[in-house]
């Protein structure tokens, strides 16, 4: 089972690693559509900042193999609505309203957590519409 942190059995926990558990890493605000990359996992806030509509895309497992249990937090600080969706909707499923695939949106100053629950299935929870 994924622990949510990139450690393996036998690793020694340093003070700096332990301190990292209490702080989120904030990426530079994206001003264009953004597709998640492997470095976005583990306590990352991906900021979106555009005056008009913008998209946060979740890639297929074949292109970016996030571990099941990965959480990516998305924060929309721009005035434009941010849509969270799959790069390939026929392969990756984004769920926010039960079992029906959806593309939830975030208004300005709202956030959501994208949680990988299976190979190509993500739940999106938070201040979504």
Predicted features by range, described:
Residues 61, 69, 100-111:
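Tight coil/turn sites that cap or link beta-strands
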Residues 7, 36, 66, 104-106:
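Hydrophobic beta-strand core residues of beta-sandwich domains
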Residues 88-102:
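Extracellular beta-sheet repeat scaffolds used for adhesion and glycan interaction
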Residues 104-129:
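Low-complexity acidic/polar repeat-biased segments
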Residues 8, 77, 116-117:
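Generic beta-strand structural signal
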Residues 4-6, 12-14:
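C-terminal trimerization/auto-chaperone modules of long, extracellular attachment fibers and adhesins
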Residues 13-90, 120-129:
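Exposed extracellular interaction/assembly regions and N-terminal maturation sites
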């Amino acid at each position: 089972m994924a622990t949510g942190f990139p450690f393996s059995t036998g690793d020694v926990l340093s003070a700096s690693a332990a301190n990292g558990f209490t702080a989120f890493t904030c990426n530079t605000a994206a001003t264009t559509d953004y597709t998640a990359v492997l470095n976005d996992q583990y306590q990352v806030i991906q900021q979106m900042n555009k005056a008009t509509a913008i998209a946060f895309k979740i890639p297929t497992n074949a292109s970016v193999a996030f571990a099941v249990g990965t959480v990516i937090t998305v924060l929309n600080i721009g005035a434009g609505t941010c849509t969270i969706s799959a790069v390939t909707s026929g392969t990756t499923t984004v769920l926010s309203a039960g079992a029906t695939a959806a593309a939830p949106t975030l208004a300005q100053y709202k956030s959501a957590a994208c949680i990988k629950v299976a190979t190509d299935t993500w739940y999106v929870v938070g201040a979504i519409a």
